[in-house]
C-alpha cells in the first residue's frame, strides 16, 4: 500500500486519544473507577447463573432486550415505551449522540465533565461548545442558559451529579435548562442514587426534549455485567432507538438485572453505607494538613493537594489506586477516589496524613 493508512481513516481520529485509566485497574485497594465496594453476594450470583444456564446459548438474544426494559420500566413505574436498555451506559451514549449529532451540529458540554462526551462528539465531527464550571466546581447555570441561547446549540449534555467534580444541579435548574432550550437535553444520572437532589425522571413526559441516562455500574454494583438505560418520552425514544446496535445486551444481563432489582434492599443498604462513609471521609480530609476536600454529591470525593502527581504515585506504590484528575479544567492538583470498605478508607486516610 502506497498511501498512508491514516488518510483512509476517519480524520476525527487525529484529535482523539485512546481511552485509558492512569495507573491501571488492579490494586490492593482500588478506588479509582467509582465502583461499588460491594460485590453481588454469592447466593444471588448462584441464583442468577442457575437461571442463565437454562437459556439457549447458541441463539441470539432479542433484537432489543425487551425483558430487561420491561423489568426496569416496572421498577421505575413508567411505560416500557420510554425505556431503552444498552450494554452499559457508554454504549447508550454512543447511540444517543449518533441520533442527535453529526458534522457541524453544536453540542454544549459543561467543563469539566465525563470525557467520553467530548470524544464521541469529536468522532461525529460536531462542534463542541464548553461552559466552564465556577471556581468552586459548581455548575454555572446562568452561563449554560446564556450560551445555549446565544450559540443556538442542538444538543446539551449534563452529568448531574457530575463526574469528575461531584457537584449537582437542582431539579428545578435542570427543568429550566430543558424548558429554555430548543435543543435535546441529555441528563446523565449515573450517580443519582447518591445525590441530595431528586431525579428529573418525572419530567420526561412534560419535556419532550429531555433524555435521562442511567447506569447499573455504580450504586447497583453491576459494572462487570454492563447495563445502562435511556429514559425519554416514547416519541423521542422511538427516534433514539434507530441507531441502536441490535442484539447488544445479553440474556445474562437481563436475568441479572431482574434478580438484583428483586433484591433491591441490597442496593439501599450499600447506598446508606456509602453516604455515611462519604461524610466520614470528608470530615477526616478536613483534618489533614495540605488537603482541601470538596463537598460531594456522589460516591466519590475530590481533594486538592500541593502535588497531585507525587501523592498519586506514593499511594500507588503502597497499593492504593486513586484517580489523578489534575488534567481537567479548574482541577489542578486534584485527586478523586470513591468510597471503599471501612478498612480501605482508613488506610487511605492514614497514608494521606503521612504526606
Curated annotation (Swiss-Prot):
InterPro entries named among the record's database cross-references: Aminotrans_II_pyridoxalP_BS, Aminotransferase_I/II_large, HisP_aminotrans, PyrdxlP-dep_Trfase, PyrdxlP-dep_Trfase_major, PyrdxlP-dep_Trfase_small
Coiled coil stretches, renumbered: none
Pathway assignment: Amino-acid biosynthesis; L-histidine biosynthesis; L-histidine from 5-phospho-alpha-D-ribose 1-diphosphate: step 7/9
Family matches, as Pfam families: Aminotran_1_2
Gene3D superfamilies linked to this entry: Aspartate Aminotransferase, domain 1, Type I PLP-dependent aspartate aminotransferase-like (Major domain)
Chain positions with N6-(pyridoxal phosphate)lysine modification: 218
UniProt-listed Enzyme Commission number(s): 2.6.1.9
Assembly description: Homodimer.
Name of the protein in its database record: Histidinol-phosphate aminotransferase
Record organism: Pelodictyon phaeoclathratiforme (strain DSM 5477 / BU-1)
Organism ancestry: Bacteria, Pseudomonadati, Chlorobiota, Chlorobiia, Chlorobiales
Amino acid at each position: 500500500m502506497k498511501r498512508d493508512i491514516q488518510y483512509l481513516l476517519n480524520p476525527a481520529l487525529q484529535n482523539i486519544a485512546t481511552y485509558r485509566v492512569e495507573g491501571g485497574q488492579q490494586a490492593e485497594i482500588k478506588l479509582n473507577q467509582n465502583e461499588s465496594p460491594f460485590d453481588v453476594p454469592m447466593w444471588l450470583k448462584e441464583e442468577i447463573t442457575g437461571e442463565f444456564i437454562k437459556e439457549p446459548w447458541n441463539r441470539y438474544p432479542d433484537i432489543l432486550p425487551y425483558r430487561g426494559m420491561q423489568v426496569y420500566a416496572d421498577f421505575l413505574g413508567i411505560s416500557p415505551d420510554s425505556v431503552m436498555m444498552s450494554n452499559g451506559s457508554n454504549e447508550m451514549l454512543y447511540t444517543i449522540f449518533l441520533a442527535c449529532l453529526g458534522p457541524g451540529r453544536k453540542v454544549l458540554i459543561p467543563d469539566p465533565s465525563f470525557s467520553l462526551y467530548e470524544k464521541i462528539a469529536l468522532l461525529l465531527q460536531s462542534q463542541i461548545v464548553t461552559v466552564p464550571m465556577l471556581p468552586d466546581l459548581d455548575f454555572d447555570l446562568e452561563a449554560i442558559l446564556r450560551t445555549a441561547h446565544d450559540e443556538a446549540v442542538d444538543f446539551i449534555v449534563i452529568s448531574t451529579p457530575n463526574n469528575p467534580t461531584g457537584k449537582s444541579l437542582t431539579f428545578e435548574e435542570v427543568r429550566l435548562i430543558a424548558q429554555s432550550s430548543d435543543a435535546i437535553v441529555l441528563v446523565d444520572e449515573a450517580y443519582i442514587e447518591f445525590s441530595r437532589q431528586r431525579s428529573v425522571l418525572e419530567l420526561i413526559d412534560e419535556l419532550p426534549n429531555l433524555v435521562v441516562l442511567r447506569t447499573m455500574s455504580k450504586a447497583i454494583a453491576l459494572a462487570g455485567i454492563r447495563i445502562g438505560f435511556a429514559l425519554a418520552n416514547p416519541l423521542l425514544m422511538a427516534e433514539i432507538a434507530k441507531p441502536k446496535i441490535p442484539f447488544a445486551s445479553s440474556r445474562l444481563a437481563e436475568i441479572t438485572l431482574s434478580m438484583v432489582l428483586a433484591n433491591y434492599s441490597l442496593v439501599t443498604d450499600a447506598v446508606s453505607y456509602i453516604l455515611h462513609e462519604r461524610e466520614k471521609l470528608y470530615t477526616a480530609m478536613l483534618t489533614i494538613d495540605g488537603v482541601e476536600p470538596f463537598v460531594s454529591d456522589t460516591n466519590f470525593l475530590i481533594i486538592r493537594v500541593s502535588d497531585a502527581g507525587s501523592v498519586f504515585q506514593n499511594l500507588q506504590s503502597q497499593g492504593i489506586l486513586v484517580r489523578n484528575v489534575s488534567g481537567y479544567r479548574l482541577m489542578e492538583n486534584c485527586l478523586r477516589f470513591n468510597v471503599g470498605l471501612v478498612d480501605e478508607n482508613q488506610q487511605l486516610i492514614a497514608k494521606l496524613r503521612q504526606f
